[in-house]
Structures are given as structure tokens and as C-alpha cells.
From Swiss-Prot:
Entry protein name: Probable GTP 3',8-cyclase
GO biological process: Mo-molybdopterin cofactor biosynthetic process
Radical SAM core domain ranges (all copies): 6-234
Keyword terms, alphabetized: 4Fe-4S, GTP-binding, Iron, Iron-sulfur, Lyase, Metal-binding, Molybdenum cofactor biosynthesis, Nucleotide-binding, S-adenosyl-L-methionine
Keyword S-adenosyl-L-methionine (UniProt): yes
Pfam family, one: Mob_synth_C
Organism: Thermoplasma acidophilum (strain ATCC 25905 / DSM 1728 / JCM 9062 / NBRC 15155 / AMRC-C165)
Family in the record: Belongs to the radical SAM superfamily. MoaA family.
The protein's enzyme class: lyase
Entry binding sites for [4Fe-4S] cluster 1: 22, 26, 29
Gene name of the record: moaA
Molecular function per GO: 4 iron, 4 sulfur cluster binding; cyclic pyranopterin monophosphate synthase activity; GTP 3',8'-cyclase activity; GTP binding; metal ion binding; S-adenosyl-L-methionine binding
Cofactor: [4Fe-4S] cluster
Assigned EC number: 4.1.99.22
PROSITE patterns, per the entry: MOAA_NIFB_PQQE (PS01305), RADICAL_SAM (PS51918)
Length: 324
């Protein structure tokens, strides 16, 4: 039976950050809400916390980083997680290491991947990521399909005046590779909304979604956040598009059923908060670990609440007017 927080939200999945190291330097990366300090969890510690979490009803895991495939023990970690999780195990990756290990990841128990591709244009890709590895990322999409790590999702963070015009080509790439395209809103906490970088690159996805909705031939709904998945036809087939819009979105928070694990061994109750983190690294007693899990769940609270969404338009309008 799942465990519920004070707001009636069940905890059904874990989002496990394996590291903070990455071979990209995307300027908008939130690093799963952590800094680069701290010793990483061992495979044994990860398995222990997954085992305990499963006892409380967790049966789905997302692996993240940093870049999780930079860990030499990634195959072992996936295998240990699979011992206890019969549901979906997925991983978010930039894909640069994936062609070499995709089949081994699948064999170990990984079900599918999200691959980050924030522009199909080499120069814009370089500006965003600081690398020239776009060809390796595209190869990773193909390798993931070949290995059966499907459905592949392509993560595309939409950035004002930078990659918005790349969306039509991204739709083609997704259709060519039978992948789902996730258009993701640039996300930050309340304090970050006033930063020059956020105001320069954040754009509301509502107008883009309205255009896609008009052209869609069908719609499905995502289980996690009850968000729509649009089906569109193009010259390369049918493509599915999801919009991830967490910024000042109380509905997004209301449907959150995920508990996060930081790479340094903490239960993290919310991406946008660190003051409610519950450390567990070094705890080997399973009863104590169960207590810490319960404490973390009791501290879960929606970051965005009803009333916050009104400020979305105010923030957006202010940013637009000041950028003119």
C-alpha cells in the first residue's frame, strides 16, 4: 500500500540522482536542486533505499544526474534497482555515453530513456551545452531505439529567442525516430525568477501548446501529472508531444507522486526546496531508514499552490516588456 503525504498525494516513485558530474554545461540546469558537494551514494546504499521505498509502495524509478552514465557502476546500479522494482525504470541522459552501453543497460533492467537535445542546430547546441557533441546525441537516440529502451523521450527545454524556431525540426527528428518530444518550460524557484538569465530566456509554453492543440489529430493523458500528450502528423509519420510546465503551476504540484534522492544521500521532498531534505547516507539500519522515509513523506508540500498561477502572467508580462 502506498504512503500518503499531508496533502493526500501518494508517493509512488523515486527520482534518484546518481551524481552531479556532467560533461555538458547547460546554463539552465537546476542540477536536481543540489550542489556539487558530498560523497556519492554507493550501489549498496542505493539498493537499500530502493528496497525500503518499495515496501512503502514505490514501484517506479527515474535515474538522473549530473550525467548518470558517467558513473562506471551504472550497469550494476540498474541491476540492483531491478531486484526490487517491477515497474518502470527510466533514465534521463544527455546520451553521449549511451551508444556504448545501451544494450547492457537494457539487459540490466532499464526500460527506457529520456535524451536531452535542446537544439538540432550545431551552433545553438554548442551555445546551450558548451559542447560539439550533437552527432553523438542523435546517435544515442538511434542506439536507444535499437536496444529497446523505448519509448524514447527527447527532452527539449524551450528558450526564448534561442531555440523556439527549432521546434518544427525537433518534431521531425522525433517522428523519424519514433520518439516522444517533451517541450519543457525553463524552470526556477521564486528567487530565480528575478534573475537576468531567467527573464531573458523564459517563455510561456501556453501559446505554443495552443498551436499544437489546433493541429493535433488526437490527445492522450500522462499518468504522472495528468498532462495531455498531443498526436500530430508530419511528413515523417505521427509524433507525440508533451508539454512540461511546472513553473507556478499548482496542478503540476498537486499531481506530484515522486520523492527525490540526492547523490549525497538525502530524501529531497521537492526540487525547489532544500530546507526539508532528510539525510540518510551512512544509515545501514533498515528500521531507521524506514523512519527517515516516513519523516520525508510527512514533510512533502506543494511548492506552487493555488493563487500562484496568477503571478505567472504578471512575471511573464514584466519580463517581456523589459526585454523590448
Amino acid at each position: 500500500m502506498p504512503i500518503y503525504d499531508r496533502y493526500g498525494r501518494p508517493v509512488l516513485s523515486l527520482r534518484i540522482q546518481l551524481n552531479t558530474t556532467c560533461n555538458f554545461s547547460c546554463f539552465f540546469c537546476h542540477m536536481e536542486g543540489t550542489d556539487v558537494n558530498g560523497e556519492e551514494l554507493t550501489p549498496e546504499e542505493i539498493e537499500r533505499v530502493v528496497k525500503i521505498s518499495h515496501e512503502f509502495g514505490v514501484n517506479k524509478v527515474k535515474i538522473t544526474g549530473g550525467e548518470p552514465t558517467l558513473r562506471a557502476d551504472i550497469i550494476d546500479i540498474i541491476g540492483r534497482i531491478r531486484k526490487h522494482i517491477t515497474g518502470n525504470i527510466s533514465m534521463t541522459t544527455n546520451g553521449t555515453m549511451l551508444p556504448k552501453i545501451a544494450k547492457d543497460l537494457k539487459k540490466a533492467g532499464l526500460d527506457r530513456v529520456n535524451i536531452s537535445l535542446h537544439s538540432p542546430d550545431d551552433e545553438r547546441f554548442h551555445f546551450i551545452t558548451g559542447t560539439r557533441m550533437i552527432d553523438r546525441v542523435l546517435e544515442a537516440v538511434r542506439s536507444a531505439n535499437d536496444a529497446g529502451l523505448t519509448p524514447v523521450k527527447i527532452n527539449f527545454v524551450v528558450l526564448k529567442d534561442l531555440n523556439v524556431n527549432d521546434i518544427p525540426r525537433m518534431l521531425e527528428i522525433a517522428a523519424e525516430n519514433n520518439a516522444i518530444l517533451q517541450l519543457i518550460e525553463y524552470e526556477t524557484d521564486r528567487e530565480g525568477e528575478s534573475s537576468e538569465e531567467y527573464r531573458r530566456y523564459h517563455i510561456s509554453l501556453d501559446p505554443i501548446e495552443a498551436q499544437i492543440r489546433k493541429k493535433a489529430i488526437g490527445v492522450e493523458y500522462n499518468d504522472l501529472h495528468n498532462r495531455p500528450r498531443y498526436l500530430m502528423k508530419n511528413d515523417h509519420g505521427v509524433v507525440k508531444i508533451e508539454f512540461v510546465k511546472p513553473q507556478r503551476n499548482p496542478d503540476f504540484c498537486a499531481h506530484c507522486t515522486r520523492l527525490r534522492i540526492t547523490s549525497r544521500g538525502e530524501f529531497k521532498t521537492c526540487l525547489m526546496r532544500s530546507d526539508t531534505n532528510v539525510p540518510f547516507k551512512g544509515v545501514t539500519d533498515e528500521n531507521r531508514l524506514r523512519d527517515l522515509f516516513r519523516i520525508a513523506v510527512s514533510l512533502r508540500e506543494p511548492y506552487w499552490k493555488p493563487g500562484d498561477e496568477q503571478q505567472t502572467e504578471e512575471t511573464y508580462d514584466s519580463a517581456i516588456s523589459e526585454s523590448k
